[in-house]
Amino acid sequence: MLILTIETSCDETAAAVVRDGRTVLSSIVATQVKDHAVYGGVVPEIASRKHLESIPVVIDEALRTASVSLDAIEGVAVTQGPGLAGALLVGTAVAKAIAFARRLPIVGVNHIEGHLSAIFLEREVAFPFVALAVSGGHTHLYRVDGIGRYTTLGQTRDDAAGEAFDKVAKLLGLPYPGGVEIDRLAAEGDPASISFPRPLLHDGSFNFSFSGLKTAVLNHVRKNPVQEDGQQLRDLCASFQRAACDVLVTKTLLAAETEGIGRVVVAGGVACNSALRRDMAREAADRGIELAIPSPSLCSDNAAMLAVPGDFYLSRGISDGLSLDALVNWPLDTIRTRLES
């Protein structure tokens, strides 16, 4: 099945053409980083306007790169949520217009389900597995028993990990997007130079909390001002990053061991972080756990990842029709009802 996928949940306008939920013929992403950098974060109104400007061009480019026309498309998958309301509405409106004009089946895909499924565009992973979805808006642990079959094991109680990275970067005066800058500076820093807390590390749950870690960094900077782009800044970034990664790695692998599952998938924008990828790989290998992390281009927001669940649902006759609407909040473990209806 040849499907067109559209992603506009936050600040990336993306479209892709994918065959049979595995073969990516094109994947186009228009970023808005420069538009939001001056504000130090995503401005929802600006994001929506940029989506409106970019989406026709992005879809045309996806079709052109795939060497297909809309006549060849057999279905449409679009990010339905969670995400920014205005941004989601742009994508869903365009997707429904295409589906209506071409009389195509359309299905809404959960943004997090897309991230957890991205790995299947590069390799197969046997079910069940434990998945860490870690990004600017989400830090969740799931047991995944199949497409559409998710059980929440733990989640952040406050800030998402990516949000903590961005907020720490902002208080340090680093450019947006901050997570990338922290990763870059940390590579030349000493992660043992500052002892930051590891919130909830040994509380017996699979939940996360990053607000306390963020506050600890703020208090340290107030007492120990750092020079711009000096070694102290590099050491601070490395120490903060190590603390955050320690919690993510420890909780994820403990969840896998507790569930009796020997496979872990890490997905989402923060999965691009070099320290997280390295530390997770080392610790997983030491425990005999199979680890799968998509390439960085598939960790950040993209439309190709939607094709895995999109094709799964559409090929089984599961679609939403033109009543599909944006869902700002859409818990992943509620998707199971789609398979049961």
Swiss-Prot record:
The answer to whether UniProt assigns keyword ATP-binding to this entry is no
GO BP annotations of the record are: tRNA threonylcarbamoyladenosine modification
Q: How is the cofactor bound?
A: Binds 1 Fe(2+) ion per subunit.
Q: Tell me a GO cellular component.
A: cytoplasm
**Per its UniProt record, what InterPro entries does this chain match?**
ATPase_NBD, Gcp-like_dom, KAE1/TsaD, TsaD
Q: Which cofactor does it need?
A: Fe(2+)
Q: List GO molecular-function terms, semicolon-separated.
A: iron ion binding; N(6)-L-threonylcarbamoyladenine synthase activity
- Which reaction(s) are listed as its catalytic activity? L-threonylcarbamoyladenylate + adenosine(37) in tRNA = N(6)-L-threonylcarbamoyladenosine(37) in tRNA + AMP + H(+)
- Residues holding Fe cation: 111, 115, 301
Where does the protein end up?
A: Cytoplasm
Q: HAMAP family from the entry?
A: TsaD
**In which family does this protein belong, per the annotation?**
Belongs to the KAE1 / TsaD family.
So what does this one do? Required for the formation of a threonylcarbamoyl group on adenosine at position 37 (t(6)A37) in tRNAs that read codons beginning with adenine. Is involved in the transfer of the threonylcarbamoyl moiety of threonylcarbamoyl-AMP (TC-AMP) to the N6 group of A37, together with TsaE and TsaB. TsaD likely plays a direct catalytic role in this reaction.
Instruction: Report the protein name in the record.
Output: tRNA N6-adenosine threonylcarbamoyltransferase
Tell me the organism: Geobacter metallireducens (strain ATCC 53774 / DSM 7210 / GS-15)
Please state the gene responsible for encoding this protein.
tsaD
